[in-house]
Amino acid sequence: MLKPLLAISALSLLSLPACAQDTQTKPAPASAAQSLPFSPVIVSGDTIFLSGHLGRLPGSRDYPDGGIGEETRQTLENIGATLATVGASHSDLVRCQVFLADIADFAEMNTAYRKFFPANPPARTTVAVSGLAANASIEIECTGRVGHGDQ
C-alpha cells in the first residue's frame, strides 16, 4: 500500500515544473514602491490577476487634481498600462473590486468607470473602507482572462 502511494507522490512532484511554467509574473513599474511584497500582475494559465491599483500619476507619488472622477480615471489608465505588459486590455477583465475611502464618491466614480467599460462591463463589487494605502481615495483590483475581449 505504501509503494503505490509513494509512486503517486513522486509523479505529482514531477508535474510541478509544468504547472510553474504556466505562471508569468511581471515586475512592478519603476514608479511603484519596489520594496512591497507583491506583484502588480500575475498570469496563470489564461487567468490574469491584478493587484490593487491606485490613481497615482505615472512616475509620481501624486494623484491627479479634480477629485474622485480624475483619480478613478487615472486608476483605470494605470490598470490599462499594467494589462498591456501581458498583452491584455480592459476588455479582457471579467471581475473588478472597487474600494472607496468615501462611499459618497460612488456616483462620480461610476461616471468615470463607465467610460472604460461602455459595453459588457466586468462583474464588480464596490465597498467603502476606512482607509487605503498612500492616502488614496480609490483602489481597484481586477481579474481577467487572456483573450476574453476577443469574444
Model-derived features: positions:
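N-terminal presequence-like segments and the immediate start of the first folded domain
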Residues: L2-E77, A81-V94, L100-Q151
